Regions:
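Conserved short alpha-helical segments that host acidic/polar catalytic motifs at enzyme active sites
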Residues: 1-183
Length: 183
C-alpha cells in the first residue's frame, strides 16, 4: 500500500493490487483494482481481506488504452495452466502485430491496453513451455519498445525490462523479501 502511494506521482488514474499465497491452491490469486487514487481504491477493509506472501501492485496514467476501470492493473488472467497477474509500465511499438496474431487464434480482449496483449502472449507461451520463466522470456523476445513488467504466477514473481533499459526496473532485497519497482 505505502509503496504504491509513494509511486502515485507517476499515475493517478487507477490502481490495483493482486496477491497470492505460495502455499495455497493453484491459481488462487486475489485482486482488487479500479479507477481512482490509491487511498480511494485500496481501502483498509479491502486490503485486510487480501492474504498473500506474493503481491504486485500498479498505479496507472494511461498512454495507451482508455481511462476505464477495465484497463486498471494489475491484469489478472485465468488460463489452462492457472492464473497470472501482470503489471506493465511502458509502450510497445509492435502492439498491432502482436494483437493481430492473437486475434487470428481466437483471442477475445477485455481491455484496450497493450498490457493485455503481453499477458495473453505470456499465457499462450506458458501452455507450450516447461516453466513460467521460459514463457516470459519467449514473450519478451517478441516485444519491441520500452517496458518494465512484473508478472506473478501463484508461486513466483518475475521482473523483466526491455533490453535497452528504457523503462527502469529496480530490485530491492531485505532479509528474505524482494521488491521490484519500475521507477
Amino acid at each position: 500500500y505505502y509503496g504504491l502511494t509513494s509511486l502515485q506521482h507517476r499515475g493517478q488514474e487507477s490502481c490495483g493490487l493482486a496477491v497470492s499465497r505460495t502455499d495455497g491452491e493453484r491459481g488462487n490469486v486475489q485482486f482488487h483494482k479500479d479507477l481512482g487514487l490509491v487511498s480511494e481504491v485500496l481501502r483498509e477493509d479491502t486490503i485486510r481481506n487480501m492474504e498473500g506472501d506474493l503481491g504486485i501492485g500498479h498505479v496507472r496514467y494511461s498512454t495507451t488504452g482508455a481511462s476505464v476501470a477495465e484497463n486498471a492493473q494489475p491484469l489478472v488472467l485465468s488460463y489452462i495452466k492457472g492464473t497470472l497477474a501482470l503489471a506493465h509500465n511502458g509502450n510497445l511499438i509492435n502492439t498491432p502485430e502482436l494483437k493481430w496474431e492473437l486475434i487470428q487464434n481466437g483471442a477475445i480482449f477485455h481491455t484496450t491496453t497493450d498490457s493485455e496483449v503481453i499477458a495473453f502472449h505470456v499465457a499462450r507461451e506458458r501452455v507450450h513451455s516447461k516453466t513460467v520463466e521460459e514463457a516470459v522470456l519467449k514473450t519478451a523476445r517478441k516485444l519491441k519498445g520500452g517496458y518494465a513488467l512484473v508478472i506473478m504466477s501463484p508461486r513466483k514473481l518475475i521482473g523483466v525490462r526491455d533490453p535497452l533499459g528504457l523503462k527502469p526496473l529496480c530490485l530491492g532485497k531485505r532479509d528474505n523479501t524482494y521488491v521490484l519497482a519500475s521507477e
